[in-house]
Amino acid sequence: MVQQQQQSQQRMMELHERNDREKLARKTEKEREEERRKQEDDKILQLEKKLEEFQENARFIGDLASNFQTKYQDALNGRIYTLVRGLQDLDRMKGTFSDKKVPLDLLPYLDDGKNPCLYSKHCMEKTLEKNKAVNGKIEIYKKFRAHLMKEFSEEMPDLVMYYRSIREDLDLS
């Protein structure tokens, strides 16, 4: 009896230890996932920073070139060099975003200076319209089938009864 109690206690301790190990594994898995998300966010922030720097350099070069004076030649050359270096940095960064897909339809929105969320909104609206159209077609086919079965049941009741016995899942409401 005492030996059975000891074995039972030992099994309970083993179960508790295993549960603790599983909790720790789940916790570390959550921490790893959180760390991955943080790294992704850091990459995106770094890309945003580089793009903003590139945009600012391009704007400044445009200002210098539109009001060009020879005394600003060195500043213009420096900005062009910075712009080229920024493009090289962006080219190096492209490998870290190879798993990201950007729809080509989004680019005209960005070119027009529109918010990218507008693109998402328009896509959702188009999808809703298509869903409504498809749901309408489905309803029309259901009504057609019900009407057809009604007409068949008036003309050929025996055949319709046989058909309904085969297709028990048929809902004609």
From Swiss-Prot:
GO MF terms on file? transcription coregulator activity
A Pfam family of this chain: Med10
Query: Which residue ranges have biased composition labelled Basic and acidic residues?
Result: 13-42
Q: Which GO terms describe its biological process?
A: regulation of transcription by RNA polymerase II
Its domain of life reads Eukaryota
**Can you say where in the cell this protein is located?**
Nucleus
State the UniProt keywords alphabetically. Answer: Activator, Nucleus, Transcription, Transcription regulation
Output a single Gene Ontology CC term carried by this record: mediator complex
InterPro entries recorded = Mediator_Med10
- Ranges of compositional bias, category Low complexity: 1-10
Give the region (Disordered) as residue ranges: 1-42
Q: How does it assemble?
A: Component of the Mediator complex.
Role according to the record: Component of the Mediator complex, a coactivator involved in the regulated transcription of nearly all RNA polymerase II-dependent genes. Mediator functions as a bridge to convey information from gene-specific regulatory proteins to the basal RNA polymerase II transcription machinery. Mediator is recruited to promoters by direct interactions with regulatory proteins and serves as a scaffold for the assembly of a functional preinitiation complex with RNA polymerase II and the general transcription factors.
Q: Which family is this sequence assigned to?
A: Belongs to the Mediator complex subunit 10 family.
Its recorded name reads: Mediator of RNA polymerase II transcription subunit 10
- According to its UniProt entry, this protein's organism is Caenorhabditis elegans
